[in-house]
């Protein structure tokens, strides 16, 4: 099976170049949508403003269900930005001639690492170093020696699962689309495109949800 055709690949076959150009394209589209939504704010929203307000409200409600309204509002800018960026990055891969930057492990891992570092920082900042790391010991003192390494490994596995879940699903979608186009290039595969579009939104939703869940668990004050 050959390489996935991309328009940017006509300029250079370098993997880093293709990855960076698609990532910058996703960032540019996200910034353009935000600018369009804020360029002519109205009391009764219409057009792009209406879509963006509905999106922000949905993200806030999701966060409220996970960690309460106050905390959800605090982290709304971060989670909403991640969701918008990841969603657009995923959707780019649905368009023939483009490849989702989330289909590159470098992108998915960097994004997951950023979330991992930030929620640990927030947990330490809000609870203190000792109290934050104490929850890795478990509730039974005589099992501390056993639970601590297990909890540490489990904690770092979040980084792996968060990055590989996004990368694996999006990369698989790209391969699926390539196979469909190879088997039936003369027929517009509407059903696969609809499915891939749904999956693009779903993966962005899952990434946002997990970000809220990890933030919520990091800042929660628990007594052991």
Curated annotation (Swiss-Prot):
GO terms for cellular component: plasma membrane; proton-transporting ATP synthase complex. Gene3D superfamilies: ATP synthase, F0 complex, subunit A. The chain crosses the membrane at residues 17-37, 78-98, 104-124, 136-156, 176-196, 201-221. GO terms for biological process: proton motive force-driven plasma membrane ATP synthesis. The keyword Ion transport applies. It holds the Pfam family ATP-synt_A. It is a multi-pass membrane protein. Keywords: ATP synthesis, Cell inner membrane, Cell membrane, CF(0), Hydrogen ion transport, Ion transport, Membrane, Transmembrane, Transmembrane helix, Transport. Its main location: membrane. It is found in: Cell inner membrane. One of its GO terms (molecular function) is proton-transporting ATP synthase activity, rotational mechanism. Belongs to the ATPase A chain family. PANTHER family: ATP SYNTHASE SUBUNIT A, CHLOROPLASTIC. F-type ATPases have 2 components, CF(1) - the catalytic core - and CF(0) - the membrane proton channel. CF(1) has five subunits: alpha(3), beta(3), gamma(1), delta(1), epsilon(1). CF(0) has three main subunits: a(1), b(2) and c(9-12). The alpha and beta chains form an alternating ring which encloses part of the gamma chain. CF(1) is attached to CF(0) by a central stalk formed by the gamma and epsilon chains, while a peripheral stalk is formed by the delta and b chains. Key component of the proton channel; it plays a direct role in the translocation of protons across the membrane. This is ATP synthase subunit a.
């Amino acid at each position: 099976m050959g390489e996935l055709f991309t328009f940017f690949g006509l300029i250079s076959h370098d993997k880093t170049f293709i990855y960076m150009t698609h990532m910058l394209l996703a960032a540019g589209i996200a910034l353009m949508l935000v600018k369009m939504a804020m360029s002519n704010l109205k009391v009764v929203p219409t057009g792009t403003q209406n879509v963006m307000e509905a999106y922000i409200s949905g993200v806030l409600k999701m966060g409220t269900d996970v960690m309460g309204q106050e905390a959800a509002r605090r982290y709304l800018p971060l989670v909403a930005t991640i969701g918008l960026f990841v969603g657009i990055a995923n959707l780019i891969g649905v368009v023939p001639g483009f490849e989702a930057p989330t289909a590159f492990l470098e992108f998915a891992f960097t994004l997951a690492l950023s979330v991992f570092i930030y929620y640990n920082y927030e947990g330490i900042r809000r609870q203190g170093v000792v109290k934050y790391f104490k929850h890795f010991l478990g509730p039974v003192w005589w099992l501390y020696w056993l639970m601590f390494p297990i909890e540490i490994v489990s904690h770092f596995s979040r980084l792996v699962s968060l990055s590989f879940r996004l990368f694996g699903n999006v990369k698989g979608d790209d391969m699926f689309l390539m196979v469909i186009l190879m088997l039936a290039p003369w027929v517009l595969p509407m059903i696969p495109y609809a499915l891939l579009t749904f999956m693009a939104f779903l993966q962005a939703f899952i990434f946002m949800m997990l970000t809220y869940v990890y933030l919520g668990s990091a800042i929660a004050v628990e007594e052991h």
